[in-house]
Amino acid sequence: MTENKRILIYGDSNSWGYLDDGNGERFQYRWPIEMANYLSNIFSVDLIEECLPARTTNLSDPVLGSSFNGELTLEAILLSHQPIDHVLIMLGTNDLKAHFDRNINDIVNAIIGLAKITRSTPAGRGGWFSDDVPDVSIICPLAIGQRANDPSWDRAEEWSGAYEKSLLLAHTLQKACNLAGI
């Protein structure tokens, strides 16, 4: 039998499966699990879900702190889960929050930076004394819902301007991934 493919998902609440209903629960059928179920028809999969609600690409939140800064924790997470065959990064949504005041290029560059960290961390199949690195892919987060522009929404101020910026993310990220060879 062939070895299982070890796939690590590095994401935020969108990958964690957060239900935006105020209860803090998660979807039973999250996309990482559905992906692994689909891929298991082709090969054996060990899914590693490293998904944390409120995680940013490379920003420490002024309220939540540095534990949610994806850049600060990525290398240790990769090394702790080795061997890893493939890393899927889906971050950037929380960088759209108004208090971070980021433009789309800052967010895209931060996402590409996470891919570069992954490509330089020896967490692949070769073991502790190998330079093998996992493959990496970036999944662009979905556009923010128009509810972010509804002043009656209790979190509208937190997400002010996020909808418009999120519409630019896919195209800008695709161009950056092409330039970076991702």
Model region roles, listed by residue range:
Residues 26, 33, 62-65, 101, ...:
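General N-terminal targeting signals
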